[in-house]
């Protein structure tokens, strides 16, 4: 077996999502740096691993995957006997985790990623942050966080009282937003604030910074 390989960029939120899952499972892996600024993700040999030209790509021996949330689910299930449990096998828990992943991927991440782009990445590229876009996206994020605040008033984490993939998937975007004025949206909601402090302090999360 060739072992686990992750092809990605350390600053990519999608790549970090996979790395956090691997660290939660205490798994050894090889990280292959794909330089985004040089367009390596749009060329061979990376395109062979992900025809859509997005990081990360993943290999576990002969098994190949792309799309970060598919990769984390594979890691959580295939290595269920390793490290920390990130999923549950109960029917209702499975459904709850699936719902949480859908909400994160369709409601939280698109908005959060736009805010990261405007406030973190654009300045790095010498571009100007569009304050109007930031205001619009913060209003959208506030609505998502209101849903999270209600949910976290009922359980310690988003899917249950245990840390799962639902929580893990939010960490990379949150890590970036904590260094921006958008942090106020987390701080204004007590349950969300406590949850953010909890999940971002996990050893696995600290290892990707």
Swiss-Prot record:
What is the induction note for this entry? By ethylene, salicylic acid, copper and the bacterial pathogen P.syringae.
**Gene Ontology MF: a single term:** cobalt ion binding
Q: What catalytic reaction does the record list? A: RX + glutathione = an S-substituted glutathione + a halide anion + H(+)
Pfam families in the record: GST_C, GST_N
What highest taxon heads this organism's lineage? Eukaryota
User: Which GO biological process annotations does it have?
Assistant: defense response to fungus; response to cadmium ion; toxin catabolic process
* Enzyme Commission number(s) of this protein: 2.5.1.18
An annotated GO cellular component of this protein is:
cytoplasm
Localization, UniProt: Cytoplasm, Cytosol
Keyword Cytoplasm attributed = yes
The answer to whether UniProt assigns keyword rRNA processing to this entry is: no
Q: What's in the keyword line of the UniProt record?
A: Cytoplasm, Detoxification, Stress response, Transferase
Which part of the chain is the GST N-terminal domain? Answer: 2-83
Q: Where, by residue number, does the polypeptide cross the bilayer?
A: none
Which family, according to UniProt?
A: Belongs to the GST superfamily. Phi family.
Function description: May be involved in the conjugation of reduced glutathione to a wide number of exogenous and endogenous hydrophobic electrophiles and have a detoxification role against certain herbicides.
Q: What is the protein's given name?
A: Glutathione S-transferase F7
